[in-house]
Amino acid sequence: YHHSSQFISELYAVDAPNSDLIRYGGYLPSGMLFLLFSLFAIWEKPKSKTKTIGFLGVGFGYGFGTVICSIFNCDAGCNPEFINPSLSQIIHNLMGLLTYLIVPVSIFIITLDVKQNKRFFKYSFLLAALSFIFMILLNLSLQSHYKGLIQRVIEGCILCWIVLYSVYASKSNKAI
């Protein structure tokens, strides 16, 4: 397995070693936790429609998306040419695309609601922009030898934003 040239989903694709352990022991629970993170962030104060919409996007896109992708794994090699894909591959790809379209935009929406916190705004905007730019790059280069690296930049931006939000929310003793 090569992290820079293979999709993350190839770790748990059909016929991959330990795919069920990775799917059900790693990705499924992490998706549920991302969904819970988003729901708890919505319930925190101060409440706003903008924040609620943004966190629904993060929860649906990243949380629910990870759950769906763990249940519907991709075909062996993740079939980037999309030649005779299985139903599981089709669902996996559609959910992955929705995730990478929705989550950067959702982070940006949340960022708009916290302009008063300049540092959080600046880092959130940067992470949202980078994840969106790399999402476009990934979709333009599905055959690239660096597609795994590109995907990991997207994932890293999203995960860094979740940590960033958590740190800022905990420092202020309330959600941002």
Where are these regions (language model features)?
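Hydrophobic cores of alpha-helical transmembrane segments in multi-pass inner/ER membrane proteins
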Residues: 26-37, 96-109, 157-170
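Terminal transmembrane helical module of multi-pass membrane proteins
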Residues: 108-176
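Membrane-proximal helix-loop-helix units in multi-pass membrane proteins
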Residues: 66-107
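Membrane-interface interhelical loops and short amphipathic "cap" helices
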Residues: 1-18, 78-87, 142-147
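Hydrophobic alpha-helical segments of membrane proteins, primarily the transmembrane helices
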Residues: 24, 28, 53-56, 60, ...
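C-terminal TM-helix exit segments that contain a strictly Trp-centered aromatic cap at the helix terminus
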Residues: 64-76, 133-143
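Interfacial helix-start motif at the membrane-water boundary
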Residues: 11-32
